[in-house]
């Protein structure tokens, strides 16, 4: 029996540019702010049996499960796309795995990483007390219908200037800008900022936005 070539097709998301921004932001949040300290980062490497290279970012999640985001380069040389990149997002646990979309990946990451509103924040907002928490991953809530409590807390977080010190919000925005700035720079720029203290409670803009995924 003549055996032809067997193909295994998996869904990937094409990205318009190089992956330095994604890799730099992951390293910044892993080694500088420690928000992703438990995440495993595997730099770009050549796959021995294939013609493409791959990098991996593995997020340990609750319930002994993991989310893995793989970045591929040079997947389709026969079409001349030698500099094209794509990513694959996979959730897996023991004995089961499935591919997920970027919005689902945001929800999975936020279930374990980055701070969010605490349970008592609604009561504090009703009593007019100072807010003690905020959501550093708002993109993770956009894939589902938000509750009235969450919408109210977002409004309080954005507009409640007389009741809370703006230091937290300024630091939040500063962390966000610093993260994206470092994501655009190379390793030399990281060394020049080695004397700066690490920022706490970093803001994460979302998987699709960082990778600039083309739907």
Curated annotation (Swiss-Prot):
GO terms for biological process: viral life cycle. It is a peripheral membrane protein. The keyword Plastid does not apply. Transmembrane segments: none annotated. Processed in virion by the viral protease. A motif (BC-box-like motif) lies at residues 147-156. The BC-like-box motif mediates the interaction with elongin BC complex. The HCCH motif (H-x(5)-C-x(18)-C-x(5)-H) mediates the interaction with CUL5. Homomultimer; in vitro and presumably in vivo. Interacts with viral Pr55Gag precursor and human APOBEC3G. The interaction between Vif and APOBEC3G is species-specific, which may play a role in restricting the replication of HIV to humans. Forms an E3 ligase complex by interacting with human CUL5 and elongin BC complex (ELOB and ELOC). Belongs to the primate lentivirus group Vif protein family. This is Virion infectivity factor.
